[in-house]
Amino acid sequence: MNEQYSALRSNVSMLGKVLGETIKDALGEHILDRVETIRKLSKSSRAGNEANRQELLTTLQNLSNDELLPVARAFSQFLNLANTAEQYHSISPKGEAASNPEVIARTLRKLKNQPDLNDATIKKAVESLSLELVLTAHPTEITRRTLIHKMGEINNCLKQLDNTDIADYERHQVMRRLRQLIAQSWHTDEIRKQRPSPVDEAKWGFAVVENSLWQGVPNYLRELNEQLEENLGYKLPVDFVPVRFTSWMGGDRDGNPNVTADITRHVLLLSRWKATDLFLKDIHVLVSELSMVDATPELLALVGEEGASEPYRYLMKKLRARLMATQSWLEARLKGEKLPKPAGLLTQNEQLWEPLYACYQSLQACGMGIIANGELLDTLRRVKCFGVPLVRIDIRQESTRHTEALGEITRYLGIGDYESWSEADKQALLIRELNSKRPLLPRNWEPSNDTREVLETCKVIAEAPKGSIAAYVISMAKTPSDVLAVHLLLKEAGIGFAMPVAPLFETLDDLNNADDVMTQLLNIDWYRGLIQGKQMVMIGYSDSAKDAGVMAASWAQYQAQDALIKTCEKAGIELTLFHGRGGSIGRGGAPAHAALLSQPPGSLKGGLRVTEQGEMIRFKYGLPEVTVSSLSLYTSAILEANLLPPPEPKDSWRHIMDELSVISCETYRGYVRENKDFVPYFRSATPEQELGKLPLGSRPAKRRPTGGVESLRAIPWIFAWTQNRLMLPAWLGAGTALQKVVEDGKQSELEAMCRDWPFFSTRLGMLEMVFSKADLWLADYYDQRLVAKTLWPLGKELRDLLEEDIKVVLAIANDSHLMADLPWIAESIQLRNVYTDPLNVLQAELLYRSRLTEEQGKSPDPRVEQALMVTIAGVAAGMRNTG
């Protein structure tokens, strides 16, 4: 096993050495010596040397303000390099990758070996595959785009160095390039100076498409096709592309006043512009490659006499001209010019598909299949996956905004105040108006700014080319009227088709009521007629965990999904569950394969739609090869979940989960909501207040500027606890509940659940992962340095609880140590701890200095503030997730 990691370790130490040389060149030997001393002390402290641990603390506390930034940057940059090496390891022939595309082959073989499954059934499951990944601009992507690009280049260098027959002079060239890149990174400011605007975030999303997905998706489809041919003798149809991408960047206005209707309009245009840009590059290649003369009569008829000598080129050049005209028009629109639409403006995917597919069919018919299945096939698949919009956009808005808008309308019309009506009265008005032929909105009415914004957004959806908006998501949805209200507002804007409207259920109570709300909606005849047998529902992971703790939330999510699946099945409705899970465990993140197989039976029948957030986008789709591997994992998990569904849990297991849920929720809320010391402790023991200074995302950290934990967004809440290594939201309450059930004599039942029920074993696996990243001595050190003595007992109580929780989880899982079944992850955490620990200690020191300066009424020292931001970014890199 260690053989596998030796390549990773040697890359990590080689990159570290180059970084050391860079630091020495930039700042001199003494700074490098200081960094090296700290690194060695940290390594020894990790190995259990108490004297060196004390020396590490003293050394870091005694750094002068001038030394703070270089030391913080050294460890932070090192972690970024270690992550780059690890990402490369996951795709290198010597590392994990050797087996990743194999995952599809393994799954197909496993399915073929099932006595009750035949090839036709498997083929049918493949044909109904549907995977929609929704890219969200959570403020968790802490690394700047500039640096992400350099990391990608470093990755290429590692790939070249891995080549066994590389000549010495080539090796020297690659090493020189590596030194340049690491020096460029060192001399680049890793912290953004301004918050990104929603448009910047959208551009970041387009960069992921251009740099990785554009190549990764066709490569994945080739891989999938190869495995299907080999194992089932089945070829994928040309137009079969089971994966699509949607984005929340520029569409998600929930709690983000910076995302306006104008911004969404701009991002839609920008997205189309980027699509023309990328397709132009493809067509440019095809113009030069498709020089063939032989063509079918159909193709020759299409090009006429003018194009007969080089029919394929002729068609490609015509398509290129259309793309260029479309691009010019979009450019003018983006600059605010109002131009008439040119003839042949590309607005629908068919306009791109038809000429390309005509060439494909002709090449196949004329015996040139090998040419047809080259670049041309990749471009055809990109048309299906990305098309004219590039990525579709979801619109997301909070339910109360629609209620307020309708309240304003009804008050103006003199028919009462919609906001204060009962649910039955609201539904009566909405259904009456939805059935009515006359408009609801008065012509000369001047709405308030907030209402105008809601109505304008609906207008943007109505104007957008069909297919460029994927869904309208209603956050904090609680009642049927929340869904009907959006349908009415969309109707008023002139949308003539059934736009998918997805309620998002995200608190414990809302999850528990989700099935009831959907049952009521499906009982409304008008609604049943509108949705034409299809319904999307979004399950919120992050807010429910923040509301009730991770154990109660995950059981509520399971039960809500289970009930919705059964209700929709009975009603003959195709349900798509949309999972809003984050990168971190406290926000529902889990290794994809395990997470999907742990859902209720039938939950993936309508395909998988899931958010991919912030830094997870880079870890899963940052390079074409990583994209292939991530999409392959998803594909095999969906096939397996649909063809070999997990067992229905026994009634006794459900009762135990109900019990665990109640106890864990009471424990969690007992601390977070009811303990008067908790909020002051949270504010002082974590960098929660300082996080607000980081220019991370375009959305504010709080939904409302005042208030306690409940007003915080789920992401800063998790981010803050990840920084001080207590990782509290991801475990609080869970272990206490498990302990209580063990004491009631049900340990053997829990062990059986762990063995035979994927839902439960995944929960425990996620707890183990969090426990591996948590650190008691560091959390204790934050308390000693930053927390008032009166609050120390609370910190001690929480740490003792964590220690007890670890013991009980290991006992139920029958493991002697954490992550026993995932040594690769344990290895990766150990490797990074040596570099993350000094950043944590330094962060506590910087928080202490920064807060002291503030208390003394002095103006902040920019060196301290900058170093603090760097430690926050560094710890995030070390933990491999932020919020």
Curated annotation (Swiss-Prot):
EC assignment: 4.1.1.31
Catalytic residues, chain numbering: H138, K546
Function description: Forms oxaloacetate, a four-carbon dicarboxylic acid source for the tricarboxylic acid cycle.
Biological source species: Salmonella choleraesuis (strain SC-B67)
Keywords: Carbon dioxide fixation, Lyase, Magnesium
Highest taxon listed in the record's lineage: Bacteria
PROSITE patterns: PEPCASE_1, PEPCASE_2
A GO term, aspect molecular function: magnesium ion binding
Gene: ppc
The protein, known as: Phosphoenolpyruvate carboxylase
UniProt-listed InterPro entries: PEP_COase, PEP_COase_bac/pln-type, PEP_COase_Lys_AS, PEPCASE_His_AS, Pyrv/PenolPyrv_kinase-like_dom
